[in-house]
Amino acid sequence: MLSLTIKELVSHFKAKKCSPVDICATCIKEINDSSFLNAFVTVLPEAAEKQARESHARWKSGKPRGPLDGVPIAVKDNFCMTGVRTTCGSRMLANFYPPYTATVVERLQGEGAVVLGKTNMDEFGMGSGATDSAFGPTKNPWKNAGEAADDWYITGGSSGGSAVAVATGCSFGALGSDTGGSTRNPASRCGVVGLKPTYGALSRHGLIPLTNSMDVPGILAKCVDDAAVLLSATACADPNDSTSVSAPDSVRHLKLAGEPSLKGVKIGVPKEYHCPGMCPEVLDLWRDVADRLAALGAVVSSVSLPHSRYSTECYSVLNCCEVASNFARYDGLEYGHRASDDSSTDALYAASRHEGLNEVVRGRILAGNYFLLRANYEKYFTKALQVRRLISDDFTKVFASGVELLLTPVTLTAALRHSEWTLKDNRERASVEDFCTQPVNMAGLPAVSVPCRLSREGLPLSLQLVGPKFSEAAMLAAAKRLELELSFPRLDLQLHAHQESYATL
């Protein structure tokens, strides 16, 4: 049952082949059995069971709320939920219980979805491996590399827990967040669909901010159809989020054809994304899929996004500057971790932030404060804003030329062993993990990561489709056609259930 898609599960509810209560219990058991992967920070069995019983009553009376009623969902631990611990994977918020619920979570619950718990993540979303959480790293379910303590594969990040929850069947969908690729990256690593909607299509209210101008709620799902259902359920204008907009009906009421046609669809392949560090397997996949799209009737051509080559540096400056501003609130006084050293206000600030925030977070705060110094403001922050505009303009020009979608890699390699990952510094990780994903966030565009094939080592490889703003319908239609063409193998849940050697790592 855990291998069913959302649409298949709802069909089972309609036919009374199973009930939301049964499915909820099965998911909770799977979460507990898979605890060695460390996908969840907080599990909510009692609350989930209550929601499942209420859903069962609605199905029994013939009055389900919609296509998500009774469907188990996981939520990344940077979305607020009333009275539910929300940590952002950080010691700073280890005991933070929000007084309100994020709008996207409210909308899912309003559709009858059953929230199972909160998923693990890189601390405050600042990472690409899901290895930097205060609650320990999340492990990739696709392959156990060996018996050494650090010889396992990373999930990608920062929404690694959500990706693992979906890949293992612990949940039928999940919320992530995407600031520079944090939904698409782990989706790619874990063999699930990862959707980054257009900036503003989903409310950010209740999403604890990292970089306000780029953060968006993301969606992780088993298939493109499921991602479309979750998108339609969550897209809305929200008076609590001034950056949200009323998305077109094609986004809010998205319906995909059974077998979408690609005939005549113009797809661009950005030449700048063929960059140093790309492994041959990803390059071969990219070329092969472009050829297969052409065989399906698409018009595939090379395009240029010349300023994307500066995206890593540009993103780094802007991200650090916004982090420095946003994280001034974590001072140990109003909420969050409070150190015992209260000899002075300055000492309390310093000790609370040192104890509560990891080295990566503290490093970005320091860098952001440096970039924002009066002597450096024009040289770094203003210049980065100008480059961001150039990156965005490149996309605008390509789409104005008649190109409808772009096809790019998501990451430059398959998932790395943790032992390899730890050898790279944070800057090197970003250049490999986020080069192909960050430009989309800076332009505010929609993108979707689609699993394509397994590497020679048996790890998922994915590609990304990118479209103009609010083109989710056309983009997901192409993604679904690609999904049907490639028939990516899902994780063998029975085999996964017996990978107990992970538990000793």
UniProtKB/Swiss-Prot annotation:
Please describe the quaternary structure of this protein: Subunit of the heterotrimeric GatCAB amidotransferase (AdT) complex, composed of A, B and C subunits.
Query: Which pairs of positions does the record mark as disulfide bonds?
Result: none
The EC number(s) this enzyme carries: 6.3.5.7
Top-level taxonomic group: Eukaryota
Q: What is the annotated role of this protein in its UniProt record?
A: Allows the formation of correctly charged Gln-tRNA(Gln) through the transamidation of misacylated Glu-tRNA(Gln) in the mitochondria. The reaction takes place in the presence of glutamine and ATP through an activated gamma-phospho-Glu-tRNA(Gln).
Q: What is its main location?
A: mitochondrion
Spell out the InterPro entries in the cross-references.
Answer: Amidase, Amidase_dom, AS_sf, GatA
Protein name, please?
Answer: Glutamyl-tRNA(Gln) amidotransferase subunit A, mitochondrial
Q: Per the record, a Pfam family?
A: Amidase
- Report the GO terms under cellular component: glutamyl-tRNA(Gln) amidotransferase complex; mitochondrion
Q: What are the subcellular locations of this protein?
A: Mitochondrion
Family to which the UniProt record says this protein belongs: Belongs to the amidase family. GatA subfamily.
Q: Which UniProt keywords apply?
A: ATP-binding, Ligase, Mitochondrion, Nucleotide-binding, Protein biosynthesis
Q: Which residues are responsible for catalysis?
A: K76, S158, S182
| One of the GO biological process terms | mitochondrial translation
Catalysed reactions, as listed in the record: L-glutamyl-tRNA(Gln) + L-glutamine + ATP + H2O = L-glutaminyl-tRNA(Gln) + L-glutamate + ADP + phosphate + H(+)
GO terms (molecular function) for this protein are: ATP binding; glutaminyl-tRNA synthase (glutamine-hydrolyzing) activity
PANTHER family xref list: GLUTAMYL-TRNA(GLN) AMIDOTRANSFERASE SUBUNIT A, MITOCHONDRIAL (PTHR11895:SF7), TRANSAMIDASE (PTHR11895)
| EC main group | ligase
As given in the record, the signal peptide range reads none
